A protein has these predicted regions:
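Single-stranded RNA-binding regions, centering on S1/OB-family and related RNA-binding modules
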Residues: 1-106
Length: 106
């Protein structure tokens, strides 16, 4: 995969604040990684933005988290995730996404 912008399959639940989500990824090592991300980086399983009321307390959905591909090594990819970490994940949980449009004032 040559895309710089990717999605990672994960489990998503509500964070402590209305504009954040808790995500859980499976790492290439088999370990689970739990992090926090702004809601704008989280998507439903089919790639749609999460509605503000889509996550109820104590519920978890299967979804996607936005990430940047750092290195693709075939079966394993190194990605930067929204909480600032770089992790190794199985290439099987990575899917392509469209780059975000930059808005610059003139």
């Amino acid at each position: 995969m040559n895309a710089k912008f990717v999605y990672l399959e994960c489990q998503i639940s509500a964070g402590a604040f209305s504009d954040e989500c808790v995500f859980e990824l499976k790492l290439a090592s088999g370990d689970e990684y739990i992090g926090i991300a702004p809601r704008k980086y989280c998507r439903t399983e089919d790639g749609h933005k999460l509605a503000s009321d889509s996550l109820q307390k104590k519920s978890t959905i299967t979804g996607k988290i936005a990430a940047r591909l750092i290195r693709n090594g075939g079966d394993v990819a190194v990605v930067a995730i929204p909480d600032g970490e770089a992790v190794e994940v199985s290439a099987g949980i990575v899917s392509q996404r469209e780059p975000e449009t930059s808005h610059v004032s003139v």
